[in-house]
Amino acid sequence: NVRKGPSADQAIVWVFSRAGLPVEVIAESDNWRRVRDSEGADGWVFHSLLSGRRTVLVSPWTKTPENVPLYSRKSKSASTVAELAPSVLGSVLSCDGEWCELSIDDYSGFVQQDKLWGVYRGEVLK
């Protein structure tokens, strides 16, 4: 449940319908976190409802069905493991500031970091 303010007394403004979606924490108030989603909507969530596991969405801003390649190595010349549709959800294994290693269903590989929502440009995750 995402609320209007940092309290259980505040109105619920929306409910996430899909588990594991990435959010950006933009503020804190006691045990509440103000989060923003990939569409720019924000609200307050109780801290225990959030996970420390990093996930990303593949180019959710794309209006056309332009797939993003999942490469076998950190190189555009590497073989393509899969073609990822916009808004596919993936688990982050690591990021080096330019590439992220992802796990998506039965696939794993590398995606250019600027094609992902849920990690910052240049962010390094080990």
Regions found by a protein language model. Name each.
Residues N1, S7-A8, V15, P22-E24, ...:
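Boundary regions of SH3-family modules and the immediately adjacent low-complexity/disordered segments
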